[in-house]
């Protein structure tokens, strides 16, 4: 085979002192990219998320999302911040042993993307006896309205909380959430900004939008 010798530098580029990790995302464009996050981002997001979810040390969240995914990662550092116990299993949601694990370990919360809840819906989730499950949270894309309402009403009628969220990998996951008390009434809305955060809409000239049903940029 033909080959060419090339002299290259053996020095590595200097990393920024505050860089904690690179988070993969496809973003709205569909092309893969990496988002840079500093340690302060993790600390702030952990505080904000644990605050609006009202997380506590006795919580036992079930981990089903991958750690390289922004929402899965945010679930970890927000719960670790309050000293909660994170339940980890390699079992699929379609495996009967997954549900045995959930019940035996008394899981108190479940976080998923729209596809996760589509699977739960097909598995007759609403007929299951899950007395320890207190909180269901959703993110990772817009959920079909009928399915959103179905889970919101189930949680309302069974003493549980349903909280849909909106976010971006660039913002360490969650940027907005719809409080459980508005889950049915305001279904489809991204809700309000997370604690210590602000959201606003602007028009093409950069002016704030204050009227309803007006298109703009967030």
Residue ranges and their predicted role:
Residues 200-218:
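Conserved beta-loop-beta connector loops within the AMP-binding
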Residues 107-112, 121-185, 198, 208:
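Gly/Ser/Thr-rich phosphate-binding loop
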Residues 188-193:
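Short Gly/Pro-enriched turn/cap motifs at secondary-structure boundaries
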Residues 43-60, 68-109, 194:
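Conserved AMP-binding/adenylation subdomain of ANL enzymes
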């Amino acid at each position: 085979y033909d080959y060419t010798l090339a002299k290259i530098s053996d020095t590595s580029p200097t990393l920024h002192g505050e860089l904690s990790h690179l988070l993969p995302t496809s973003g709205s464009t569909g092309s893969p990219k990496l988002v840079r996050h500093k340690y302060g981002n993790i600390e702030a997001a952990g505080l904000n998320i644990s605050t609006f979810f009202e997380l506590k040390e006795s919580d036992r969240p079930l981990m089903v999302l991958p750690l390289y995914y922004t929402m899965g990662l945010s679930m970890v550092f927000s719960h670790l911040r309050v000293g909660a116990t994170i339940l980890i299993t390699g079992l699929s949601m379609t495996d009967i042993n997954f549900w045995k694990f959930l019940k035996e370990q008394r899981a108190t919360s479940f976080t998923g993307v729209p596809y996760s809840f589509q699977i739960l819906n097909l598995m007759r989730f609403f007929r299951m006896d899950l007395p320890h499950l207190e909180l269901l949270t959703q993110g990772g894309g817009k959920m079909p309205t009928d399915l959103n309402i179905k889970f919101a009403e189930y949680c309302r009628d069974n003493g549980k909380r349903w909280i849909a969220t909106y976010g971006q990998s660039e913002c360490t996951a969650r940027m907005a959430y719809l409080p459980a008390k508005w889950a049915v009434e305001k279904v489809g809305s991204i809700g309000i900004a997370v604690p210590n955060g602000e959201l606003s809409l602007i028009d093409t000239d950069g002016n704030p939008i204050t009227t309803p049903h007006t298109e703009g940029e967030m």
